[in-house]
């Protein structure tokens, strides 16, 4: 496979970057190109048919600062024909009322611009009150809690990447 997937992530503490690297490795280094959004241009999103968007939920239901800076520029990208998967890091105990909100905010914007969401993830095994990342009872993407459930991260990533390989047709 040639590098078909662009994985764009923002990170504040390094957790989301670490997860991005694990996801890349699970797909295969020759398939996924990582882009730290603090150093990327929004036009870089145009280079890929398949996208993976990673963002931690910051503060109380907010986008991570690098994504916040690019958010309005997403209006300039045509996502029609692109399959887009999302993953987020968050704390379901400390922030139970807005767990994974950031990926819900990004998914809504990108879907409005024509992106087709793939990689929905079950809420089974999570304990939270509310999330902007819910669509029809599922998360819009892989929900990770490195604060309270880090022991589940590797297995969740393996399952999600297998699901994405099928949905991306790889």
UniProtKB/Swiss-Prot annotation:
Which Gene Ontology terms cover its molecular function? electron transfer activity; FMN binding
Keywords assigned: Electron transport, Flavoprotein, FMN, Transport
Q: Report the superkingdom from the record.
A: Bacteria
Provide the cofactor list for this protein.
FMN
Biological process annotations from GO = electron transport chain
* Span of domain Flavodoxin-like: 5-165
Q: Does the keyword Transport apply?
A: yes
Signal peptide per UniProt: none
A Pfam short name: Flavodoxin_1
Return the similarity comment: Belongs to the flavodoxin family.
Role this protein plays:
Low-potential electron donor to a number of redox enzymes.
Quote the NCBIfam families the UniProt record gives.
flav_long, PRK09267.1-2, PRK09267.1-4, PRK09267.1-5
This one is known as Flavodoxin
Organism expressing this protein natively = Nostoc sp. (strain ATCC 29151 / PCC 7119) (Anabaena sp.)
Gene that this polypeptide is encoded by: isiB
């Amino acid at each position: 496979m040639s590098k078909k997937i662009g994985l764009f992530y923002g990170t504040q503490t390094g957790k989301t970057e670490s997860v991005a690297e694990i996801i890349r490795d699970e797909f295969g280094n020759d398939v996924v190109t990582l882009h730290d959004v603090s150093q990327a241009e929004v036009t870089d999103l145009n280079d890929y048919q398949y996208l993976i968007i990673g963002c931690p939920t910051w503060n109380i239901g907010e986008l991570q600062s690098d994504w916040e800076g690019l958010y309005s520029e997403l209006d300039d990208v045509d996502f029609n024909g692109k399959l887009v998967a999302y993953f987020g890091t968050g704390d379901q105990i400390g922030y139970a009322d807005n767990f994974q909100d950031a990926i819900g905010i990004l998914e809504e914007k990108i879907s409005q611009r024509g992106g087709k969401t793939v990689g929905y993830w079950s809420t089974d095994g999570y304990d939270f009150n509310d999330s902007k990342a819910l669509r029809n009872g599922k998360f819009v993407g892989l929900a990770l809690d490195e604060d309270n459930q880090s022991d589940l991260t590797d297995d969740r990533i393996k399952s999600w990447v297998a699901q994405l390989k099928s949905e991306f047709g790889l």
